[in-house]
């Protein structure tokens, strides 16, 4: 048999390659696979002394009965034990010499496959299943009325370090809660007397509102320093806005941002600074409004204090200027603004004007000077009733009418008291004999000025003297300002070097070198 297989293998190896056929495919006859193979293609016969393999006989456990083993053995026996094993017929393909040597896979005998799921080794004992799955409830009871211990109620093991850590965490949370409650209660006490302002609920509510107002109130509780002594402190405080009142900013593609100063700003600030402590109270941020304020008042002679967006507060999402943080008497404060929302908290202290749109011939700011100077001249105890009387009106026009009426009344009273004091054309011997009355509107040289006119003339002279003084000493003030900037810069550098640990710079050796 080995010899036949070897000869068949060698014959297929040394066989010459079949040349390509030029015959048309339609004339090529392909042998049918249903016909019997040639003797060379037939497999060798199986010897008669070859016996089939013994059937699989699994071992049966002692717990199972003989009937179950018999059923398993009967299921695993083949259908016909005496049938010889026949190899499969090879597949013949003409046209390829190598395909003749290849054989198809052997066909399985017609034997029923055994059912391995019924093996005794895969059978699970019911007692083992009961042990692996503990029962719950009533199933935990066993013989004798006892219950099995499942370990469900056993506590988790915690180390001493973990217990200590948890204890300190609980203590920290407790201390934080006690401190929060104590802080809320302490904030309800008066700082001077130490007494509570109200009940616990009212105190807690006020403290919580104050806590949330921290983000809405100004950055400082006191926006202005304490007033100066009487000779130097002005009796009234005038808070003025920047954008729309003193300047107007516009933007275009050609020039970018440009800021124009309103006509009469210098005269407005220089003249009213005699009667008012002028405070620039702008709703713009510091980095945008401060450079403009420096251009308007470089010496800080007329606007000594400047407040910006950080000094305002937010009420219902709106920017509001609260004068209660100014450290000044509200009855002596006037807020001049162009936005009604800015004076929403104290409307009785505000004067709302139309914003300036940048027109060059505007006189709205100068027209407000007579009204404001009259308050400084007559020195009322409270400015709020006066402002309320002009609320909703055109203040320059209404005040001009009031002033004209007051002057006419004063002249009439003076003429009634001095009927013979007549001068001018026709005044002489005949006038003294027949009498004469001055024409309406004619002026008399000896007619006295009103109190307002006298104070106004005096204020004008003071304003002119101040302007002359600032113009003559402008270079000196610029030099002082520059020296102050250099001094601040040197202090800043020294503080940084001192923070880093470097020694401070001494000016002594430098002076000695210069003298030498």
From Swiss-Prot:
Q: Does the keyword Lyase apply?
A: no
Q: Which residues form the signal peptide?
A: none
Which residues does the annotated transit peptide occupy?
A: 1-17
Q: Spans of biased composition, class Basic and acidic residues?
A: 136-161
User: Which residues does the entry place in the Mitochondrial intermembrane compartment?
Assistant: 188-516
Q: How does it sit in the membrane?
A: Single-pass membrane protein
Q: Which residues form the FCP1 homology domain?
A: 231-375
Q: Where is this region: Disordered?
A: 1-119, 131-161
Q: Which InterPro entries match?
A: FCP1_dom, HAD-like_sf, HAD_sf, TIM50
UniProt-listed Pfam families:
NIF (PF03031)
Q: Any ranges marked Mitochondrial matrix in the topology annotation, and which?
A: 18-166
Locate the compositionally biased regions of type Polar residues. 1-25, 96-107
Q: Which GO terms describe its biological process?
A: protein import into mitochondrial matrix
State the superkingdom: Eukaryota
Record field: compositional bias (Low complexity) = 64-81
Transmembrane stretches in the record are 167-187
Q: Which cysteines are joined by disulfide bonds?
A: none
Protein location: Mitochondrion inner membrane
Q: Name one GO cellular component term.
A: TIM23 mitochondrial import inner membrane translocase complex
Q: Which UniProt keywords apply?
A: Membrane, Mitochondrion, Mitochondrion inner membrane, Protein transport, Transit peptide, Translocation, Transmembrane, Transmembrane helix, Transport
Quaternary structure per UniProt? Answer: Component of the TIM23 complex, at least composed of TIM23, TIM17 and TIM50. Interacts with preproteins in transit.
Say which family it is in.
Answer: Belongs to the TIM50 family.
Query: Its biological function?
Result: Essential component of the TIM23 complex, a complex that mediates the translocation of transit peptide-containing proteins across the mitochondrial inner membrane. Required to direct preproteins in transit and direct them to the channel protein TIM23, and possibly facilitates transfer of the translocating proteins from the TOM complex to the TIM23 complex.
Its name, as the record gives it, is: Mitochondrial import inner membrane translocase subunit TIM50
């Amino acid at each position: 048999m080995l010899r036949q297989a070897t000869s068949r293998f060698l014959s297929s190896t040394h066989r010459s390659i079949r040349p390509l056929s030029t015959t048309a495919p339609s004339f090529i006859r392909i042998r049918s696979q249903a016909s019997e193979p040639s003797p060379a293609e037939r497999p060798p016969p199986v010897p008669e002394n070859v016996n089939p393999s013994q059937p699989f006989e699994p071992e049966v456990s002692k717990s199972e009965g003989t009937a179950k083993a018999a059923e398993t053995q009967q299921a695993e026996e083949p259908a016909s034990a005496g049938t010889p094993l026949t190899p499969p017929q090879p597949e013949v393909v003409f046209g390829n010499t190598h395909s003749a040597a290849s054989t198809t896979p052997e066909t399985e005998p017609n034997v029923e496959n055994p059912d391995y799921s019924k093996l005794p080794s895969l059978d699970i004992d019911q007692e083992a299943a009961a042990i692996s799955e503990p029962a719950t409830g009533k199933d935990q009871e066993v013989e004798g009325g006892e219950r099995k211990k499942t370990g469900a109620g056993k506590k988790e093991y915690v180390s001493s370090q973990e217990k200590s850590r948890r204890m300190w965490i609980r203590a920290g949370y407790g201390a934080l809660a006690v401190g929060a409650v104590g802080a809320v209660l302490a904030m309800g006490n008066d700082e001077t007397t130490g007494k509570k302002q109200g009940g616990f609920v009212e105190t807690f509510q006020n403290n919580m509102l104050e806590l949330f107002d921290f983000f809405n109130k100004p950055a400082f509780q006191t926006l202005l320093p304490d007033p100066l002594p009487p000779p130097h402190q002005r009796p009234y405080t005038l808070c003025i806005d920047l954008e729309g009142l003193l300047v107007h900013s516009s933007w275009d593609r050609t020039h970018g941002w440009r800021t124009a100063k309103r006509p009469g700003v210098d005269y407005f600030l220089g003249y009213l600074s005699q009667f008012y402590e002028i405070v620039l109270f702008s709703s713009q941020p510091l980095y945008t409004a401060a450079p403009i304020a420096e251009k308007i008042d470089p010496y800080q002679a007329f606007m000594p204090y400047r407040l910006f967006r950080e000094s305002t507060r937010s009420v219902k999402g709106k920017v509001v200027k609260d004068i209660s943080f100014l450290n000044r008497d509200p009855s002596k404060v006037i807020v001049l603004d162009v936005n009604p929302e800015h004076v929403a908290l104290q409307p009785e202290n505000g004067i709302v004007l139309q914003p300036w749109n940048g027109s060059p011939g505007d006189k709205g700011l100068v027209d407000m000077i007579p009204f404001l100077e009259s308050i400084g001249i007559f020195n009322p105890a409270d400015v709020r009733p006066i402002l309320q009387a002009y609320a909703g009106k055109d203040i320059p026009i209404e005040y001009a009418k009031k002033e004209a009426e007051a002057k006419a009344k004063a002249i009439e009273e003076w003429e009634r008291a001095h009927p013979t004091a007549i001068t001018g054309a026709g005044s002489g011997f005949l006038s003294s004999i027949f009498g004469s009355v001055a024409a309406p509107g004619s002026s008399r040289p000896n007619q006295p000025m009103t109190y307002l006119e006298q104070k106004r003339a005096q204020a004008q002279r003071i304003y002119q003297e101040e302007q002359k003084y600032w113009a003559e000493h402008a270079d000196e003030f610029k030099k002082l300002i520059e020296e102050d900037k250099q001094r601040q810069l040197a202090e800043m550098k020294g503080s940084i070097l001192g923070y880093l640990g470097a020694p401070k710079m001494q000016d002594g050796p430098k002076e000695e070198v210069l003298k030498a």
